[in-house]
Amino acid sequence: MLKLQNYSDNILKNIHLEFNKKQNFIILGSNGAGKSTLAKILCGITPSDIQIENQNLSSYNSKERTKLINYVPAKLEIFDEYLTLNEYLDLSKLHTLLESENMLKLFEIERLRNKPCQQLSSGEQQLTMLASAILHNAKITIFDEPTANLDPQKSRNIFSLLKSKLFQNKIIITHDLNLAYKLQYDILYMKEGEIVFFDSSSKFFTESNLNDFFGLSVKRLDNDIMVNL
């Protein structure tokens, strides 16, 4: 479904990646590992020879690309200071008014519908982007640190959404080991611009790998929690 071969730049080194239909995976790594750089290549923000459905992404027109892949950044960038939350959700024009209303209720942001996006808190902006991503319904959705600005309760709610079938295929960028461990999706682990592991969650979260990648700073306490010591 998605393929990137032998890509290198000033940050990434010899990246080879294939992503199949109905596969969800997590791009995991510390800050500065190259996670967001790779994500911008995968969604076409940074030019490359990436292929989706056996065709170069650049060969699709904008409408086709919109249906194929969607990038949800860690921070909402709005250049129109008067654009309201409702207007932001309507930008894609790929959904009905009822669907938009349902998203406002799902994320409990109905009261904010007429508030300019620039005046929303960072957590409210995060929820707005996630609501928009569900409405967008692209074949592949890339989430960049989806729980970064949320309190613990909202983070748990977003975790449930990421585990749900509301999205067709998911790529989730995070440095949060706990989130990655609980989601149990395939793990692509990056270090210093290189992919050093890409396989199942069960194979990644072994005592041997944890020692190799993190030394004594990480330990598995039970079946649900990973901690940084």
Placement of each model-derived feature along the sequence:
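Helix-to-loop junction immediately C-terminal to a conserved catalytic motif
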Residues: C43
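ABC ATPase NBD Q-loop/coupling interface
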Residues: Q51-E64
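Conserved ABC ATPase "signature" region
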Residues: L98-R113, I134
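Conserved ABC ATPase signature
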Residues: P116-L120
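Catalytic Walker B motif of ABC-type/P-loop ATPase nucleotide-binding domains
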Residues: T141-E145
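H-loop/switch region of ABC-family ATPase nucleotide-binding domains
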Residues: T174-H175
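H-loop (His-switch) and adjacent beta-strand-loop-beta switch element
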Residues: I187-S200
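ABC ATPase nucleotide-binding domains
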Residues: K203, S208-L229
